C-alpha cells in the first residue's frame, strides 16, 4: 500500500511531562515546512500545555497543535482521543490569528481538523474532578472525567457539539472541520509529498497503564504506542519514521501529592548547582513544580518499552550555565555530559536545548 507520509516524527516525553516537547516540535517542524505539506497532530487536552518561542513571541498551547503557529500551510489535527475545552480552544484560535496578524498580516488560509470522536468537556465534568486536585495533584481541567464518560458511552463528542460560534468568528483565517480525521488524511495522500509531526502529551512516567505510578498518573497512555492510537496513526503509514523521546537533565512533576520522585531536590539546591536562580512554574496550574535528579534506571525502563530512535535532551544549561541560550556543541563539559547520557541509555542524543527557544541538532 502506498505510504501516506514521506516521514513521520513522533515527539513524546520520557519523564513526567514538561520536558520541553514544544520547542523540539517547533524545531523539527521548521525543518519540514519547505519540503511539503505538514500535518501536525495533537492529542490530549487542556491539562497539559506546550510552550515554545517564535522570535520574540512566547506561544503556549493546550489544545491546538503548536506547529500551526509556524506557517499557514501547516494543517492542524486534533485526533480522535483529543479532549476539548471549547472556551480554551476559542482563546487559542484567537492567539493564533493575532500571531499571524503580527507576523504576516494574517495572510494565508489555514485548516484545523477536529476529529468527530474527540471528547468535549462539560461544566459537570469539571466539577467532578475537584477531588483529584487534592488527592493526586491533578490539574482538575475535566480531562479525566470527560475521558471516563467517553469510555462509558455517555460523554459528548465533537460531532455532537455546535462549533458555530467559534467557526464563524475565525472563518476568515481558519477553516475548522469536524471530520473523521483518519479518512480525511488518507484522501490527501496523492496530492504531493506530506510529512507528519506528532505532538505527544505529558510524559511516559504519567501513563495510565504502563508508568507503574497508578493512581498518580494521567488519564491516557503517553507512550508512542498510545499517541499513535489516539491519533489514528501507525509508523507503517510513512516511508520513514522517527520517534524522539524528550528528557530533561532535572525532571519535574507537578506540585502537590503528584506521586513518587527519586532523589527529589529543592529549587534552592538546583539553583546552587546551576549557578543562577532557577525555579519553574507549571504551564497550566501556575504552581511551583517539584524537581529531582535525573533517574537513569527509570529512563532505562521507559526506553525498553518505547524504543525511541533518538533522544532530545533539554535543560542542558542546568548542567552548565555557561551555555544558557547558547550553542553547546563546542563546549567540553556539554560533550562529556551528553556522551554519558548516550552511553548510559544506549540511545543517540539528536537534539539539545539550552534555554527558552534555543534548540540545536547534536547529531545529523
Predicted regions located by residue number:
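Non-transmembrane, aqueous-exposed alpha-helical and coiled segments at domain scale
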Residues: 2-364
Amino acid at each position: 500500500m502506498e505510504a501516506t507520509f514521506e516521514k513521520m516524527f513522533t515527539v513524546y516525553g520520557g519523564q513526567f511531562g514538561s520536558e520541553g516537547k514544544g520547542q523540539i516540535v517547533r524545531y523539527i517542524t521548521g525543518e519540514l515546512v519547505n519540503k511539503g505539506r505538514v500535518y501536525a497532530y495533537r492529542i490530549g487536552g487542556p491539562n497539559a500545555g506546550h510552550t515554545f518561542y517564535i522570535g520574540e513571541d512566547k506561544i503556549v498551547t493546550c489544545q491546538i497543535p503548536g506547529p500551526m503557529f509556524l506557517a499557514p500551510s501547516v494543517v492542524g489535527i486534533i485526533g480522535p482521543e483529543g479532549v476539548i475545552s471549547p472556551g480554551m480552544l476559542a482563546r487559542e484560535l484567537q492567539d493564533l490569528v493575532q500571531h499571524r496578524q503580527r507576523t504576516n498580516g494574517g495572510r494565508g488560509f489555514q485548516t484545523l481538523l477536529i476529529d468527530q470522536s474527540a471528547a468535549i468537556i462539560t461544566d459537570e465534568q469539571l466539577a467532578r474532578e475537584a477531588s483529584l486536585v487534592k488527592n493526586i495533584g491533578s490539574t482538575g481541567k475535566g480531562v479525566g472525567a470527560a475521558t471516563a464518560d467517553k469510555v462509558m458511552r455517555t460523554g459528548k463528542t465533537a460531532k455532537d457539539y455546535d462549533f458555530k460560534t467559534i467557526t464563524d468568528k475565525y472563518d476568515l483565517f481558519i477553516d475548522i472541520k469536524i471530520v473523521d480525521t483518519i479518512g480525511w488524511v488518507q484522501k490527501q495522500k496523492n496530492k504531493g509529498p506530506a510529512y507528519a509531526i506528532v505532538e505527544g502529551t505529558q510524559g511516559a512516567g504519567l501513563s495510565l497503564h504502563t508508568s507503574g505510578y497508578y493512581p498518580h498518573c494521567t488519564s491516557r497512555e503517553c507512550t508512542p504506542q498510545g499517541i499513535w492510537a489516539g491519533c489514528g496513526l501507525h509508523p507503517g503509514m510513512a516511508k520513514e519514521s522517527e520517534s524522539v523521546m524528550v528528557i530533561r537533565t532535572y525532571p519535574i512533576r507537578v506540585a502537590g501529592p503528584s506521586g513518587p520522585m527519586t532523589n527529589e531536590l529543592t529549587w534552592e539546591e538546583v539553583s546552587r548547582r546551576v549557578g543562577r536562580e532557577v525555579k519553574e512554574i507549571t504551564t497550566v496550574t501556575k504552581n511551583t513544580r517539584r524537581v529531582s535528579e535525573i533517574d537513569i534506571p527509570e529512563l532505562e525502563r521507559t526506553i525498553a518499552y518505547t524504543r525511541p530512535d533518538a533522544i532530545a535532551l533539554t535543560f542542558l544549561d542546568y548542567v552548565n550555565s555557561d551555555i544558557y541560550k547558547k550553542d553547546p556543541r563546542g563546549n567540553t563539559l556539554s560533550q562529556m555530559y551528553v556522551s554519558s547520557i548516550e552511553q548510559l541509555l544506549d540511545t543517540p542524543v539528536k537534539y539539545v536545548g539550552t534555554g527558552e527557544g534555543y534548540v540545536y541538532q547534536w547529531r545529523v
